[in-house]
């Protein structure tokens, strides 16, 4: 039996020029999040997911996306190997540690190899830009914390 696989390329056309940004993306999902930025999601199998944020002149990538706020261009991501949750401004590499998952209180989390999966389902930014960081296991809340302005100032 053959399995249907869908591959495509992401092409940016700006100022009359075509630029292929991503080749052979497997089963992409593309969402326009504002006038200038697209969010492209590509799965390579559980738990492997790639998240690309593509603007007219810049792009950003993360494998462990928890949440993002397009108004402040703030990305919340985890690094499961380093056991950290970071905030960073989109299109920069300046990361700010929000949570150290190696602290004993986080031993309750079920995931040990992909922490983002514990946080990504319920974590969100509210309409004031405050991050509600929530870890859950099948609907049971294991950890909850509100973080104001997780990426720092609103300037880029």
Sequence positions of predicted segments:
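Short beta-strand elements that form the blades of beta-propeller/WD-repeat-like
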Residues: 1-5, 34-45, 71-88, 118-137, ...
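Surface-exposed loop/turn elements that mediate protein-protein interactions on large endomembrane-trafficking
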Residues: 2-22, 45-65, 86-112, 138-156
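Repeated scaffold domains used in trafficking and secretory/extracellular systems
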Residues: 22-31, 62-79, 107-123
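Beta-propeller folds
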Residues: 22-50
């Amino acid at each position: 039996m053959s399995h249907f696989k869908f591959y495509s390329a992401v092409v940016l056309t700006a100022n009359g020029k075509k630029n292929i940004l991503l080749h052979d993306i497997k089963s992409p999902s593309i969402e326009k999040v504002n006038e200038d930025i697209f969010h492209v999601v590509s799965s390579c199998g559980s738990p492997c997911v790639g998240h690309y944020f593509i603007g007219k002149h810049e792009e950003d990538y993360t494998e462990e996306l928890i949440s993002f706020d397009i108004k402040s261009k703030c990305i919340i991501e985890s690094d499961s190997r380093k056991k950290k949750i970071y905030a960073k401004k989109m299109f920069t590499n300046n990361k700010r540690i929000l949570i150290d998952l190696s602290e004993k209180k986080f031993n309750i989390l079920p995931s040990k190899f992909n922490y983002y999966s514990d946080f990504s389902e319920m974590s969100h930014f509210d309409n004031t830009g405050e991050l509600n960081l929530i870890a859950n296991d099948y609907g049971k809340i294991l950890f909850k914390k509100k973080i104001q302005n997780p990426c720092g100032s609103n300037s880029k």
